[in-house]
Amino acid sequence: MEFKHVSVLLHESIDGLKIKPGGIYVDCTLGGAGHSLEILRRLGPEGKLVGIDQDPAAIANAAEKLQEFPGQFHAVQRNFFQIKQILREMAISEVDGILFDLGVSSYQLDTPERGFSYMHDAELDMRMGPDQTISAKELVNDISEEELATIIRRYGEDRWAKRIASFIVKERKKRAIHTTGELVDIIKAAVPVGARREGPHPAKRTFQALRIAVNNELEILEQTMKDAVTALKSGGRISVITFHSLEDRIIKDTFKELANPCTCPPAFPVCACGKQPQIKIVTGKPIQPSKEELEHNPRARSAKLRIAEKLNI
């Protein structure tokens, strides 16, 4: 299957990096390589880009799509939470800009055998890379009802989490749940008819929650952002695109902490803790897709872009 993916907030996110022709940049979520291609087009012959993705299909796609930049593009098949280690191994001490696009690629969603989508019946999987050992199928069939409800409530923010978990456990006692279609049917049965008539697909939040749990997405996000900011040169920029409120809240709070790290009581006339701001926040409010973009790519509707700049410290 061809690796198809429409890059979200493409120009806004790359404009936010303020590309320097001879700079070094990192695309931490290579995906369909659309953002990487735009960065490389703006770089001069001395500029370099490191592309990180744990999905072998994304790495293979990028190798083909970006082959016109052989000396400038370097692909790394790893999880982006290892950015500090990756740059150290490449003998790169500082970079000019870093991009994160935290959405699941259209390719992953539209490839049934990856088991990400509630729109295609396939084996339950949801692992983004070979390093993940536990699949969604194992979570759904093996963990307790309480743990399942916690995952759906915490990562999916689904009001019916407890009821969905109860229905899943009831069904798996009869037979194991193997496919996305089987899970969708259980969720539809669990969610009351009235609630199903409104809002998104009833399985959307549960599938999101399982994907986040399988890939440990949120647990590593805050520290990854801090490591990324540490890797930036003074004046370097970081652009982060999120697709749901949990991710956006983590990025927002981490940026706020890095921009104002002082822990002194409000009554103190001057700072005594000695903690210095590391960044300035460029986007007071997140940038969202235009109407034109949403017409061409409805999947972009929940995207939010936040940008920050490293201070001279």
From Swiss-Prot:
Catalytic activity: cytidine(1402) in 16S rRNA + S-adenosyl-L-methionine = N(4)-methylcytidine(1402) in 16S rRNA + S-adenosyl-L-homocysteine + H(+)
Gene Ontology molecular function terms on file: rRNA (cytosine-N4-)-methyltransferase activity
Entry keyword annotation includes Methyltransferase: yes
Xref: Gene3D superfamilies: Putative methyltransferase TM0872, insert domain, Vaccinia Virus protein VP39
Coiled coil location: none
Enzyme Commission numbers on file: 2.1.1.199
Pfam families assigned to the protein according to its UniProt record, in alphabetical order: Methyltransf_5
UniProt keyword Cytoplasm, yes or no: yes
Residues reported to bind S-adenosyl-L-methionine: A33, G34, H35, D53, F80, D101, Q108
Compartment(s) of residence: Cytoplasm
An example Gene Ontology biological process: rRNA base methylation
Enzyme class of the recorded protein, top EC level: transferase
Family: Belongs to the methyltransferase superfamily. RsmH family.
Summary of the function given for this chain in its UniProt record: Specifically methylates the N4 position of cytidine in position 1402 (C1402) of 16S rRNA.
Protein's UniProt name: Ribosomal RNA small subunit methyltransferase H
